[in-house]
Structures are given as structure tokens and as C-alpha cells.
């Protein structure tokens, strides 16, 4: 029985009750008999400042290739359509509110129970005594907060289905409601105080600009991000959003005006800036400006841009765009229109930049001007924190807010280590530029690692497989005992250790003078030194001596053993303090050496030459791939270069994202063979090989995909096998939800599972394939072929027969077959026509969907580490060789006068069997077909010759019988002879 609205309202807080009242208004306006969860969702989405609306907009904005505005509109449309399907009440409208449905009341009850189970909201639980004995709530009522009310509504199956139709996942929305993104959280600290900043929460920046030289560059991280947007070909007009957006814009404009342009790209290094924030405020102040006056001011701006002659362009600073969301004003509409015309006319030289302080302001701006994002070519750039360089030096004073961990400042831990570094340190270093770069990278990596996970987790779980070695028990003991050190002491000690390490390396390799003393105070050693780290890792081909240097068994001359420059950071353990006794490069002790020798470890050593290691790995990997995929020589070379380059390149955009490799063009079998070989080389076998096909029709019927998308299945497999090679076939056919998650994965190196949990892809090699070749993509068959790859891969196992008859009839059929084959070869691919769709959808929807997928695929493929285009396999030549071999066996039995006709299905079956055996690991794949011809086919030819003899009028035809169809591609053990 439905519950009265007044009774349900007593169970809610004031904010949640207002949301329920809005839902009741929606139900009454639509003449619905009851107020359901859908009405509540509709009301929450309509509220400008509701949590659900902000979360949905934020979630949609994470979809890179699509407009967040469009996806949010799709959600509103789906909710509206679902409400339209609900039956309307036939009774005349009354003053009573539509009662709360059983499902919505059950959601309120669930939210009460859920709120009781969360201790963090205990201090907010308000227990109110109620004297009325209403049937909806108990005498003691727990007021439900809006957040828990929304979470329970999202559990409703109908709401879940509606969100799914719009491309959202209720589980992800619930996760964002519980833990809002940073852009949402920042609003909590906007009133009079800034969010607390810990060192572990500072935004990541370029390693070369990080601690301990953060104050030396003078460039702001947000300014660098803005410069990257301005250097783009499209979407080059940044719109900064966030609490710190105004500050970031001011820092950027000050840098441009003062001539500090080092953070800009070379092609826009001469950028100039014009600020019109005051002019916009004056125009909109009283609204008295007419169209002519506004047009004259905008024309003056256009002339200024044309007369500047700046090759790098001009940026027009619009300032805070909140002024554009003011009350209706004719001058406002005219100004936006004229600025759009100016940008369209001067698009090559002119760029816009502006900021808004909150997502709510941005939403109001889009509501006011729906096309402004497209007209101004805006690129939304979230600014969640200030990135100004610290003015407190390298080691600020210890305090509660400055410690690495909360409450760390309560413990007295005065460091005995003073590092008087300043902005001029770079000029006083005696290391060469290359060694100094690597030193800075290792310092940045140490600090970044120390601020999140423990050493054991960081080293054992996060290192890529090719940088792992076996972790001895002694190492683990040292690591465990070091966790009680104060973080500031540890960081200072590591910095000094890294300085000495790279001093020794540079002195021994590049013969540079000794590093000048900077006045470090002596520190007594607390832990032994380790210059090589041993970590256990899965069995991998790259860990064998074939690809890496042999382990060090005894000390050798300094020139051979000095660890040289390595692009992928292998730093000292976080818990170790290096002690230099003046012996130069420090080696492991003999005791440790003997123990590791008994355990037979495979140490990952640093070669004295990075190029030597790269060449050795490259040649070994190329040799293995060439044996498996011998017909794709150029592609194999490119793949080996990309993978080995990623192993040794620290300049990659996201080193924590594993390796992403795109294989484009034809040869589906060759691509799959490459992925399988990589799993054998890097992870020890096919057990760590995950393969899915976005274009497969059987995915919806397979039990393992039931209730899941393709990416859901992949995340489940990666959670069980974190060290794997993932093959994603036909990635251009991915559905919209999978596209969003793949874009997030390639950008962040992390992929979300069904429940919103994040799975790291650092130790994963992702191979994405597509039949589209981006260099010469075409939908037409340029060269006519008789045996295209699609037909070979779709071949089936038929029962083969040898038919004998009149040669004249066979000849006629043969000529007809050849004619049809030639005609089919030159046909152009046609668009797919779905007869189940209405005419208007058939004409427009597929084209629009294809354009969206193409746009996403183009942007996604640019983010991978490397692209390799495969060449088509010449199946016609292989078929010709098969025909010649069959003809040779036939002539030995019947002679050259008897005519033989081969059915096309027979050629396809033999061709597919030969190709599958060649690509499934058989080095002598062709010998399998040759043996079958000798033992089976030739014997059947001899049997036919013995039964029916040989004469010129006899015709022989090798055909495929449809009665013997079998799954897979196999050659029959017997060929029947019939007349």
C-alpha cells in the first residue's frame, strides 16, 4: 500500500525532504497516481546544485571523445521517456499529493539502514521523537540524509536500467556520490579556507621540475598544462574550471606578460596576450551598450590581432566568465555573438582563455549559451589545486600540515641532515647534464613512492616485470625494520645517497671531477647499502641471460660494473641510507653474494651502456617474433623497437600504464600470433594471455560475457592475472561504455571493474588490433583477389570427394566458376542495411554512430605507445602453390591428358588448414599439408585411377560435400571416390 507523503517526509532530513517534494511535484504535473524513484531522479537532475546532477556531469566529462553535455542530455531524455511510459491517473486532479510508492518507500528504509552502518555519519544522525503513530516510520526516527537517499534510489532496478540506456553505470555513479571527484570536493573548502595540503597530495608534475629543485624552474604546472592546450590543432581554447582556476589564469597571464615563456611549445613560444576582462565588465555593467558600439569594440580587437603580426598568435583573456551567466541582457547576447564571429574569422591567430570557479557556473554558462562550447572551440581544463613553487626551501619546517603522514608533526624528529639547495644549485653541480637529469628523476621517483604505498608493496607489486629481480629474505627484513624512520629524515638521507651514487657513476663513466662539497653534516650509517635490488617476479623470457646481462658473481673493474644511465628508474630502497667510505662505487657484500648465489637469482643489472642493452633486447625479441611471424618482417622490426623503447624510455607520457601497442591493417592471424608470442616471452606462457574480440557475435551468447561488457570481462581476468598480455581485437567496434573505460585506461594506466575498484595495468602489455589501416585506409578493394582473408578465416571442414564424369561438362562449369570469381573480386564493399530499423534511423543513425566511433578510434589510437600497420597476406599465391601441388599429384596418377577441376571450397579448406598450422606454432606448417596430399589425396587419386582408368574424355573433379560439414578447419582423413 502506498505511503502518504507526510509520513515519508518525516523520515528525511530537510534537504532530502525538499528533493522528495520536488519529486511529488513532478508526479502531480504528469498526473501519475504514485511518486516513484523515477520521479525523484527527474527532480534531482533538474536541480542545478544537486549532488546527482554534478556527479553525472562529472562522470560524462571523463568521456574524452564525446561531449559531456550530449551524454547528460541523453540521460535526461531516457528519464523523460521512462516517465512517459507510466500510466496516467484517469481520475480528475485533486489537491492531494500522489503518495509514495512501495519501491520508493523501500528505498528510504534501505537508506536508513545504510546510514546506521556508516560510522563516519554517526555525529550527524539526529534521532527525533515522534508522538504520532504513523504507519510509515517507527516512533524513533532516523533522519535520512540526501546522499544516502540518492544511493538507495540508484539501487532501484528501473533506475539502473534507465542509467544504463544513457551510457552510465549506477555502480560508478554511487561510487562518485560516496567519494566525489576532486572538482566536487574542492567546493567544501571554498568558504574562507583552503583544503589541507600534504606532500603526498601535491599534484604530479614533470620529474625534472619536482623536489628538490621545485623552486628553480620558475614555471607553474598549471601554466604548462594551459600551454599544451594552446598548442593543439583543435579544442585549443582553454576554459579553466575549479577553485584555483582564477589563480592559475592570473599566474599564466603574469608569466606571458613578464616574458617567461619557457613552458610553451616551440611553435607558440612567441605568444602574446590581450586582456579584455575589464572591457567585458564595462559593456555588461549597465546593459546600455547597443549593437553598434559592441561591434566597434570587437572590430578594434580584430584590427589589433591583424596588425600584431605575431607568428605564434594572440591569446584573448576573457577573465571570469561568470559575468556571462548574469540576468538576461541584450548586450550580453550581442557580445557573445560578436566574439564568436571574431574567433571564426581569426581562428588561426587568435585563441580565447577564460575561467569559471565551479562546475555549477559552467553548467549555467552552457544552459545560457548551448553552442558556446562548439563556437568557441573550448577545451575544459580542470584546475583542482595551486601549483605555485614553494618558498619554504627544500625542507620546510616540520609541522602537522607539512609532514608526509597525518599527525607526523606531533613527533619530534629533528633531522641531522641539512641540504642547502637553492635555485643556483644546477650551476654548481659537477655532474654532466645527462647524469644530473637521471639523478633528478630518481629523487622524484623516491619521493613519489614514499608518499603512498610501503616499500614492499611499491617494489614488489608496482615494478614492471623486466625491471624485477628476486627479493631475498635479508632485503625484506631490512625493509620491515626501516618503517619506523621519520619520513623527512629518510628523504634527506636518500637524496644524499642518490647524489653520491650519481657522482660515482659520472666520475667513472664520463671522467668528471669530484662533486663539490655542499656542507652536509655527517650522519652515522643506520642501514647497509644495496646498489642492486632483488624482487621476485614471474618467470619471464626477458629475465634469462639471452636478453639481459649475466648476474654479477664477483667484483670487476669499475669501468665494467658502474651502473649507467637507465631511463626507467631503478632507485635505492626507501629505507636505506648510503654510507660512503671513500671506496668509490659500492658493491654488495660477499656474504650477501654467497647467499644469492645459493638461491640462484636472476638479478636485473644495470649495463654500462644503455644502447648495448637496448640492442641486445631488441635483437632477441625480433628473432623470436620473426620465427613465429616470418611473413611480417617490417612489422616485427617495428614491434620490437616499440616494446624495447618503452622499456628504456622515461619520457613516456604515462610510465605506469604498461605498454599499449596498436596493430592495424589486415592479417588477423599474424596479429594474434604476435600477442601470444609476447605472452610467452614476457610472462612465461599462454596462461597469462587474455583475448577478446569486440566484433564477435558470439559474445552475447557466451556464458562468460553474460551480464558483462567486453571490458568488464577483461578487468575480471586482470584482477586474477595482473601480469598478462591482453589482446583486444576489432577495438574500433567497441560500444560506448567500453570506449570510455578504454580511454581512461590508456590515459591513467588503471582500469575499473564492475564494482568501481581500480586495477593497475602497470605490468600489462595491451595489444589492440583493427582492420583499419590509418595510413591508407579505404573501404574499396584496390587489387582484385580470388581468396580474401575473410573467406580464408571463415572456411569450414568439409567432407571431400573425387567425382569422375564427362570432361566437357566439367569444362563448362570451370569456365563459369572462373568468371564468377573474377566478378566477385572487383566488388566494392557495401554499407550494412538493417531491415529491423525504421527508414529514418537506417538513413541517419548508422552514419552518425560510425562517425562517433571513428572520432573515438582516431583519438584513442593516438594515445598508444606505438602503431604498426601489417601488410596483407598474399593468399592467392599460397592458393596457386596448393593448386600446383595437387596438379602434380594428379598428373602422376592420370597423366597430363586427363582434366582436373578443383572446387573453390576445397581450395579454401586446404588453404585455411595450411595457414592455421603455419600460424599455430608449427614451424613447418606447409609440410603438414604436403604430408596430407601424399598420404591421403594421392592415395585417393590412385584408387580412382585403378577403378575407372584414364582417358582424355574422363573428367575428374575434387569437390566439397555439404553433408560432411564439421566445426573448425581440419583436413579429412579420407577422400571418397564416386562416379
UniProtKB/Swiss-Prot annotation:
Knockout or disruption consequences = No visible phenotype. Suppresses max2 phenotypes associated with strigolactone-D14-regulated growth. Smxl6 and max2 double mutants have branching and inflorescence heights similar to max2 mutants.
Q: Lineage of the native species?
A: Eukaryota, Viridiplantae, Streptophyta, Embryophyta, Tracheophyta
Q: What is this protein called?
A: Protein SMAX1-LIKE 6
Induction comment from the UniProt entry of this chain: Up-regulated by strigolactone treatment.
Which keywords, in A-to-Z order, does the entry hold?
Nucleus, Repeat, Transcription, Transcription regulation, Ubl conjugation
Q: Which family does it belong to?
A: Belongs to the ClpA/ClpB family.
- By its UniProt entry, which InterPro entries does this protein fall under? ATPase_AAA_core (IPR003959), Clp_N_dom_sf (IPR036628), Clp_R_dom (IPR004176), P-loop_NTPase (IPR027417), SL_signaling_regulator (IPR051650)
* GO BP of this protein: response to strigolactone
Q: What is its main location?
A: nucleus
Q: What is known of its domains?
A: Contains 1 EAR motif required for the interaction with TPR2.
| Region called Repeat 1, residue ranges | 12-86
Pfam family name, one: AAA_2
The answer to whether the entry has keyword Phosphoprotein is no
Protein's UniProt keywords contain Manganese = no
The annotated subunit structure for this chain is: Interacts with TPL/TPR in an EAR-motif dependent manner. Interacts with TPR3. Interacts with MAX2 and TPR2. Interacts with D14. The interaction with D14 occurs in the presence of (2'R) stereoisomers of strigolactones, but not (2'S) stereoisomers.
Q: What does this protein do?
A: Probable component of a transcriptional corepressor complex involved in branching control. Regulates cotyledon expansion and lateral root growth, but not germination or hypocotyl elongation. Promotes auxin transport and PIN1 accumulation in the stem and represses BRC1/TCP18 expression in axillary buds.
One Gene Ontology CC term in the entry: nucleus
Q: Which parts of the sequence are annotated with region: Repeat 2? A: 100-190
| PTM statement from Swiss-Prot or TrEMBL | Ubiquitinated upon strigolactone treatment. Probable proteolytic target of SCF(MAX2)-mediated stigolactone signaling.
List localization entries.
Nucleus
- Motif range (EAR): 833-837
Task: Read off the SUPFAM superfamilies from this record.
Answer: Double Clp-N motif, P-loop containing nucleoside triphosphate hydrolases
Residue span(s) of domain Clp R: 8-190
